[in-house]
Amino acid sequence: MAKLLLHTCCAPCLIYPLKRLSEQGFEVTAYFYNPNIHPYGEYKARREATERYSQDAGVEAIFPDYRPEEYFQAVHLREANPGRCVTCWTLRLAKTAREAKDNGFTHFTSTLLVSPYQDQNALRLIGGDTAKSVGLQFHYEDFRPGFRKAHDEARAAGIYCQKYCGCIFSELERYGKDKSNIGHKVTTSQGHKL
């Protein structure tokens, strides 16, 4: 059975990818690495929900220390969207890939692929490039068809469901009035145009 490390952004987004990957025969471990989530109370709510869901689902989960400085150092001078998002995805997928490589996993992927609000093409490219750099397989699958049902299931079960992606900038975009940075194109460090 192939071992897969699943970067996990939150409990609701874990539900469908975990089901699909388990059906495909992967031995899945969740990896909750999200230094982008702010404020700390929001991080704590998402982590606790992920801990509870992981226990209930019988899936092993790893929770590295919360280090928001890693996120801020990475996105410094890249605060405009989507440059900051590409940098954030790269940070989290690279950390997941290194953790997978160091601990005997053969594959990695992310629950970010379930969200209709994330850039699938960018995530696929970043995951593929990261996999090549560490010598692992990136499992790309468009999990979006299960997004709504999983989030409905989470709400019905009383699982905490957040209202923004996670970072302070996405919170401002969600609740603030200035939407001028949304939709600008960027180029990744590997030269992919997004």
Locations of regions flagged by a protein language model:
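Nucleotide-activated chemistry modules centered on ATP-dependent adenylation/adenylyltransferase
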Residues: M1-L194
